[in-house]
Design a protein with these regions (language model features):
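Single conserved hydrophobic/aromatic residue that forms the stacking wall/gate
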Residues: 1-9
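Mature, well-folded catalytic/scaffold domains that follow N-terminal targeting or propeptide regions
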Residues: 11-200
Length: 200
């Protein structure tokens, strides 16, 4: 159970002075689902392991919390792990709605790009963060791309198209956000840093 900002207002946790300041627009707040700060998730894991393996590992983490003499922190940890399992299951359903099965690891560059994107899309749809970056994924994707080019199932031009389309998809996430986020900013900004290229 988590207390959201609107609950604080409704339950009168705010003092009368705070409520008056809110009413007069002196004190404002962001929507409860607004992700604050810069988040750089490891979206590669979806492509690398597949969702079923990630769910299996999280269920093992949950089972490892079964012990006698549980404390308050243990209950919170179990709740958080259960939320993570549910989120991974929801991501699998979301990908299926687009016609993809992400239960297994990506087998080629196209799948690696798509699986990685689904990880990012699931995160930004739930966090609504203005600054949720992708990070440096080019070295990771390059492994799949190089392998597919060597096999003759992908050309340099097609590889470039994959990356171009990925960048376009990152720019279009604004359409997946909830209305309360869009009320904050004009122009639906997206600060999604994607590092491509470089050495090391």
């Amino acid at each position: 159970y988590r207390r959201q900002r609107q609950m604080c207002i409704r339950d009168s946790i705010y003092t009368p002075e705070m409520l008056k300041a809110r009413h007069n627009k002196i004190l404002t707040g962001l929507p409860d689902t607004y992700g604050r700060g810069r988040i750089v998730g490891d979206y590669r894991r979806v492509a690398l392991y597949g969702i079923d393996y990630l769910i299996e590992r999280k269920k093992a983490d949950f089972a490892a919390t079964n012990r006698q003499g549980m404390r308050r922190g243990d209950f919170q940890l179990r709740e958080e792990i259960a939320d993570q399992v549910r989120a991974l299951q929801d991501m699998k359903v979301m990908a299926q709605s687009y016609g993809y099965d992400i239960s297994e690891p990506a087998k080629n560059a196209r799948e690696a790009v798509q699986w990685l994107y689904f990880g990012y899309l699931a995160a930004i749809k739930t966090q609504n963060g203005a600054a949720m970056s992708v990070g440096r994924v080019s070295t990771f994707l390059d492994i799949y791309i190089e392998r597919d080019i060597e096999k003759g199932i992908l050309t340099e031009k097609e590889a470039q198209e994959l990356i171009d389309h990925l960048v376009m998809k990152f720019r279009m996430v604004k359409f997946a956000r909830i209305p309360s986020y869009n009320q904050l900013f004009s122009g639906d900004p997206v600060w999604a840093t994607l590092e491509v290229g470089g050495i090391g």
